[in-house]
């Protein structure tokens, strides 16, 4: 048996002591700071630095998780795009309570989010669609995301048919594809610390919409 934990103490980064400033009244301000610092530390070495884990749950309380790409963040929430007929799309329709995780282990940080997923309005989804490459627009039409695929050949044939159908035309957004916004009600910031004495600060949104922040034991 391989011991993956043997001799990995060099991976543990020392606690910087700057996890979250008391003056930060909104977790989105902290997230923006951390996201910028992550990008600076990452440079060109990480593929898809905007990747985040999205966890959903079906009506029988069976969870599922997958990696999606963060498209935008702000006070309104965290945004991504998807096929509404996919497993995650169906589960969000049945149970909009979701969770996100940003795993930035290369800088010793993690952000965990709990929130309510809502579909973005048509104009916002249209804007995301317009920003995509032509090939990505075609793939949104031909992919029956999460459905059983008989063969890779069939998918490529469907892509080619859609490509020919829209040849020389603007490609409209399919109704089954669009944006989702996760409106957070809990955001937790975790930072690695020496001797496993990590820093955890959790923001919670009250009924009035204001945020409160507490420290959690690591």
From Swiss-Prot:
Function recorded in the entry: Catalyzes the oxidation of either pyridoxine 5'-phosphate (PNP) or pyridoxamine 5'-phosphate (PMP) into pyridoxal 5'-phosphate (PLP).
Catalytic activity: pyridoxamine 5'-phosphate + O2 + H2O = pyridoxal 5'-phosphate + H2O2 + NH4(+); pyridoxine 5'-phosphate + O2 = pyridoxal 5'-phosphate + H2O2
Lineage: Bacteria, Pseudomonadati, Pseudomonadota, Alphaproteobacteria, Rickettsiales
EC category: oxidoreductase
Record carries keyword Signal: no
Cofactor(s) named in the record: FMN
Molecular-function GO term, any one: pyridoxamine phosphate oxidase activity
InterPro entries: Pyridox_Oxase, Pyridox_Oxase_CS, Pyridox_Oxase_N, Pyridoxamine_oxidase_dimer_C, Split_barrel_FMN-bd
Cofactor binding summary note: Binds 1 FMN per subunit.
Record gene name: pdxH
Pfam family, one: PNP_phzG_C
Binding-site list for substrate: 71, 128, 132, 136, 196-198
HAMAP family: PdxH
Top-level taxon: Bacteria
Organism: Anaplasma marginale (strain St. Maries)
Subunit structure: Homodimer.
Chain sites annotated for binding FMN: 66-71, 87-88, 110, 145-146, 190, 200
Official protein name in the record: Pyridoxine/pyridoxamine 5'-phosphate oxidase
